[in-house]
Swiss-Prot record:
HAMAP family: Dps (MF_01441)
Taxonomic classification: Bacteria, Pseudomonadati, Pseudomonadota, Gammaproteobacteria, Enterobacterales
Residues bound to Fe cation: 51, 78, 82
Protein name (record): DNA protection during starvation protein
Provenance organism: Cronobacter sakazakii (strain ATCC BAA-894) (Enterobacter sakazakii)
Catalyzed chemical reaction(s): 2 Fe(2+) + H2O2 + 2 H(+) = 2 Fe(3+) + 2 H2O
Length: 167
């Protein structure tokens, strides 16, 4: 097989793959996947911003907890982005795309207390958790729905941990 089949064609805007998911389902699912790529990249950066800049009671416990969250978010992000490519799409993860498409409001740079960070994080984790849960039923194939389900389980757990630390 030559490389001609591996480049984008105008006819479908999808990269060639032997995956038999219908092209229309692939396109809808790739859009959904890229929405979550944006969510997970932004949430992972916000998590690290809080991790670096918090001070006060329970610092070390929350600081270390957020490191674990960031690791898991990065794992889900990679799985989600790679699924978009597996379906013949392009994973959209540049800072320009994230900045223009994130549903998350800008994270405040002038807060320092653990409690203030936890409240800000809870709001943002809830947005992403709720959107991923919605994406499960919107996915056009079961494999993508499974990926979203795994991510949803972690996000719900992380939101619970964050909320449990808010005084």
């Amino acid at each position: 097989m030559g490389t001609a089949k591996l480049v984008k064609t105008k006819a479908s805007d999808l990269l060639y793959t032997r995956n038999d998911v219908a092209d229309s389902d692939k396109k809808a699912t790739i859009e959904l996947l890229n929405r979550q790529v944006v969510n997970f990249i932004d949430l992972s950066l916000i998590t690290k911003q809080a991790h670096w800049n918090m001070r006060g009671a329970n610092f070390i416990g929350v600081h270390e907890m957020l490191d674990g969250f960031r690791t898991a978010l990065t794992g889900h992000m990679d799985t989600i982005a790679e699924r978009a490519v597996q379906l013949g799409g392009v994973a959209l993860g540049t800072t320009q795309v994230i900045n223009s498409k994130t549903p998350l409001k800008s994270y405040p740079l002038d807060i320092h207390s653990v409690q203030d960070h936890l409240k800000e994080l809870a709001d943002r984790y809830a947005i992403v958790a709720n959107d991923v849960r919605k994406a499960i039923s919107e996915a056009q194939d079961e494999d993508t729905a499974d990926i979203f389900t795994a991510a949803s389980r972690d996000l719900d757990k992380f939101l619970w941990f964050i909320e449990s630390n808010i005084e």
